[in-house]
């Protein structure tokens, strides 16, 4: 029988529910259990694909091509699993499915209501997360906070799950903030008490509290919360601020969190062996060397817009025994006049993905600087497209070369819309999304990075591609297309072989990076940056 764990939040949002859920997932996986995890987002968007990164951080893409919340990146990196379309559910997605069924007459004339139709659809997503992955445990995080009007159908579905599958197969974990009032010199439990009261009013009694706090709460505070919130004292778990998020699973294990969960759910599983994870964390905290990477982007004010890129760089730093110092460079501020001084200290330069005109000329200046000064450079998605445009302008001397996305009237559309995208009008969910194969050129830097594999599979998120009408001109000047689709139609990876490392990929390598296994192209880039720093 599959076990279901539901993680809710109270008092404030952005309290770290995703990290708590991911940490628990890692602990249970290391006990030998098969774990999957999903995020319920109460917003009305179908998915975050059309949302501004300033609103929601990065968009994370799954193997099966679903645009999802950035928390799924945490889940995959912590637990080292690949999630699917059932791992991110929004209000918009559920309501659109229910309304589509109503239009088809599938409800046989019934009045369509929140209960049972919306809640049944939500429960179906929870159960499908289990059946499609054959998991022992499903962890479901509910976004937002208890008391939000948008969350009510989600919480009702969670309440009903207990009756559907039995109390021994369901566990509710509530995460809250434990504020410290400096003037009073004490921690305040009242916000947590009220949050639990609100949750209980909706029919859910939490079995465990996870309290986010800057300082240790002490047993007295835990006993007080246990008494007022009707949970066992040992089931009040502290989520202390830490130097690195990968410390959280170890802190949770030290408090017996996973054992309490297993006892409640009657899971007979051996203790989690966290030796390898602990060694990884110890290494992260004791890196002696530092490598400076300039990240040239348009959303640099919000670091979460590049969360997977940052994590992939850190993983690659770990693989190369170096800490990564990220220099956040606003592409809007880069010009031909200041690019050299602004990037002079960079050991390597990364130009990540993005959409739209703003910042593209600054990114092109950064790419040109990297090429002309032989600074290791990695381009990703739009970064790959701009790498091609920079080469066209300054090596092939195709003045005005551009992307048809950025300049529909350009004489030299180096980047053009994909053929199967021409007649698509909707923006959301219509990009080339998900896992696709890439055939690597033997002897190339890309092939070397991937251990000379013939084909790799990586996740994509784009609508435009390199215009192959210009391929011969590029190749005549030493530009190498080192990764292509199996049918040779799409140019996936480009590079200049005479440089230390000047490689750009149309796909998003960062989605495949894990703390214990850095993504190979990122790792090769960081290796080159480390060498460049010497």
Swiss-Prot record:
Disulfide bonds: none annotated. Belongs to the CTP synthase family. Residues 1-267 are annotated as: Amidoligase domain. Allosterically activated by GTP, when glutamine is the substrate; GTP has no effect on the reaction when ammonia is the substrate. The allosteric effector GTP functions by stabilizing the protein conformation that binds the tetrahedral intermediate(s) formed during glutamine hydrolysis. Inhibited by the product CTP, via allosteric rather than competitive inhibition. It is an enzyme of class 6 (ligase). GO terms for cellular component: cytosol. Catalyzes the ATP-dependent amination of UTP to CTP with either L-glutamine or ammonia as the source of nitrogen. Regulates intracellular CTP levels through interactions with the four ribonucleotide triphosphates. It comes from Streptococcus thermophilus (strain CNRZ 1066). The keyword Transit peptide does not apply. GO terms for molecular function: ATP binding; CTP synthase activity; glutaminase activity; identical protein binding; metal ion binding. It catalyses: UTP + L-glutamine + ATP + H2O = CTP + L-glutamate + ADP + phosphate + 2 H(+); L-glutamine + H2O = L-glutamate + NH4(+); UTP + NH4(+) + ATP = CTP + ADP + phosphate + 2 H(+). Homotetramer. UTP binds at residues 13, 188-193, 224. The gene is pyrG. The keyword Coiled coil does not apply. Keywords: ATP-binding, Glutamine amidotransferase, Ligase, Magnesium, Metal-binding, Nucleotide-binding, Pyrimidine biosynthesis. HAMAP family: PyrG. This is CTP synthase. The active site is at 381 (nucleophile), 508, 510. CTP binds at residues 13, 148-150, 188-193, 224. ATP binds at residues 14-19, 71.
